[in-house]
């Protein structure tokens, strides 16, 4: 959403954070979808959350299916994951003009979608660094981080403060961490990086990420 389809890793799902309870957020979203917009309506259906080992329940994203209809007929389902506000990541937003979406909406005769509130970049970077250096299989964050830093001027000092707070809050791995290759990353990374303006070799991408962590840690 931040950079447009031509410059980002394609994904069909949507992640969001809320300062309220995720269930209450889903209720409000469901009410808005029921009211509809330009012939589109929808409903929010809860899914069973994951149960990752040694991860407190309150840290686990709450999954939902957003089932959209157009003129009363099923159209598509969008997987949605709602997280809680950990360290103020839902307190403020970067408001972004959706140029690609605006053009697509205009071509279809729909009103402009307007601006979208996105999580501030320093929080996104901190969360992705925490994920890619954790025990999970998050090689995709190596691609996302390169896209973010090649397309945005990110405040390293602010990112450092956010990383320190997030890593201390989650109490999983210490800051600064180290990215280490995991089984299967070669093939997964190659598939994700193909056709994108990012480092094509996973080993070199890991070196880049660890150098980035050092830059942030000393900012």
Name each region found by the language model.
Residues 2-8, 18-219:
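Structured mid-to-C-terminal alpha-helical surface segments
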Residues 13:
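Non-catalytic nucleic-acid-binding interfaces of large nucleic-acid enzymes and RNP effectors
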């Amino acid at each position: 959403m931040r950079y447009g389809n031509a410059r980002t890793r394609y994904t069909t799902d949507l992640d969001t954070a809320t300062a309220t309870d995720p269930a209450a957020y889903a209720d409000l979203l469901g009410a808005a979808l029921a009211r509809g917009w330009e012939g589109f309506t929808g409903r929010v259906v809860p899914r069973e959350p994951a149960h990752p080992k040694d991860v407190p329940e309150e840290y686990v994203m709450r999954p939902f299916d957003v089932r959209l209809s157009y003129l009363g007929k099923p159209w598509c389902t969008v997987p949605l994951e709602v997280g809680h506000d950990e360290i103020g990541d839902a307190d403020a937003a970067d408001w972004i003009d959706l140029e690609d979406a605006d053009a697509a909406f205009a071509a279809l005769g729909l009103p402009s979608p307007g601006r979208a509130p996105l999580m501030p970049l320093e929080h996104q970077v901190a969360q992705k660094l925490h994920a890619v250096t954790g025990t999970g299989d998050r090689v995709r964050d190596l691609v996302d981080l390169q896209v973010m830093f090649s397309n945005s001027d990110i405040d390293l000092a602010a990112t450092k403060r956010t990383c320190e707070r997030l890593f201390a809050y989650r109490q999983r791995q210490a800051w600064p961490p180290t990215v280490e290759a995991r089984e299967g990353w070669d093939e997964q990374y190659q598939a994700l990086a193909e056709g994108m303006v990012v480092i094509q070799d996973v080993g070199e991408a890991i070196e880049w990420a660890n150098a980035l962590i050092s830059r942030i840690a000393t900012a």
